[in-house]
């Protein structure tokens, strides 16, 4: 189904924005992408998200929806006829939300400490990050995707962060594949979907952004 009047305010390296690019692609929704400069936020961004003043923001029929997991659910509910992301079973749906929330609370903040940290702080962050990934790998088990046989809510919530894996590994000198081989296989399976592969920047491009950011923050 095509949709009219859908705008996504986004920033290309944002894993949270990537989630929505994937979901919109899976659903076949046409939209206008507006790239934001986070050091000089647009009047539209400030108007549409006056509380947090953050991207991503989905604007649908002139109404703003904020916070990426909330937007993911909105997309799934509004365009429910293609590629459902959340399971129909209430218990399974609650579990998908639990793991997506776990990803939100753990991956970004710990990952940031991995690429930006030094010495003991970085080593501690790396240890924590690996434990988080191992917890997620345990939940994945022997399934193809987190929800079973089809790409779903938890996959879309997590897979954008895999575009940052190279940066984490390079900055902190470790191998995610050595620690969590099943998770890396899962990531490669997700990337077989064009909706995923075309929505994620190349890991080397992300690494270039990380180096620029470290320099800007005086961490280089």
Swiss-Prot record:
SUPFAM superfamilies assigned: GST C-terminal domain-like (SSF47616), Thioredoxin-like (SSF52833)
CDD domains in the record: GST_C_Tau, GST_N_Tau
Induction details: By auxin.
Biological process (GO), any one: glutathione metabolic process
Protein name, UniProt field: Probable glutathione S-transferase parA
UniProt domain GST N-terminal: residue ranges: 4-83
Reaction catalysis annotation: RX + glutathione = an S-substituted glutathione + a halide anion + H(+)
Residues that bind glutathione: 14, 41, 55, 67-68
UniProt similarity note: Belongs to the GST superfamily. HSP26 family.
Gene, per the UniProt record: PARA
Cellular component annotations (GO), alphabetically ordered: cytoplasm
Domain GST C-terminal: residue ranges: 89-209
Domain of life the protein comes from: Eukaryota
UniProt-listed Enzyme Commission number(s): 2.5.1.18
One MF annotation (Gene Ontology) recorded for this entry: glutathione transferase activity
PANTHER family: GLUTATHIONE S-TRANSFERASE PARA-RELATED (PTHR11260:SF756), GLUTATHIONE S-TRANSFERASE, GST, SUPERFAMILY, GST DOMAIN CONTAINING (PTHR11260)
Alphabetically ordered keywords of this record: Auxin signaling pathway, Transferase
Family matches, as InterPro entries: Glutathione-S-Trfase_C-like (IPR010987), Glutathione-S-Trfase_C_sf (IPR036282), Glutathione_S-Trfase (IPR040079), Glutathione_S-Trfase_N (IPR004045), GST_C (IPR004046), GST_C_Tau (IPR045074), Omega/Tau-like (IPR045073), Thioredoxin-like_sf (IPR036249)
């Amino acid at each position: 189904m095509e949709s009219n009047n859908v705008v996504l305010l986004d920033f290309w390296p944002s894993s949270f924005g990537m989630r929505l690019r994937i979901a919109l692609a899976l659903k076949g929704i046409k939209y206008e992408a507006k790239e934001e400069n986070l050091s000089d936020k647009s009047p539209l961004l400030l108007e549409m998200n006056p509380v947090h003043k953050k991207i991503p923001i989905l604007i649908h029929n002139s109404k703003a929806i904020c916070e990426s997991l909330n937007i993911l659910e909105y997309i799934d509910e509004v365009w429910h006829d293609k590629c459902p992301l959340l399971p129909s079973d209430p218990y399974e749906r609650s579990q998908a939300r639990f793991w997506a929330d776990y990803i939100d609370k753990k991956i970004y903040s710990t990952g940031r400490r991995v690429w930006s940290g030094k010495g003991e702080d970085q080593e501690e962050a790396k240890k924590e990050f690996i434990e988080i990934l191992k917890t997620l790998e345990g939940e994945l088990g022997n399934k193809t995707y987190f929800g079973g046989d089809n790409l779903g809510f938890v996959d879309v919530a997590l897979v954008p962060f895999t575009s940052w894996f190279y940066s984490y590994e390079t900055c902190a000198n470790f191998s995610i594949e050595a620690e969590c081989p099943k998770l890396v296989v899962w990531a490669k399976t997700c990337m077989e979907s064009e909706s995923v592969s075309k929505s994620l920047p190349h890991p080397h491009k992300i690494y270039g952004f990380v180096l620029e950011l470290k320099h800007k923050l005086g961490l280089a």
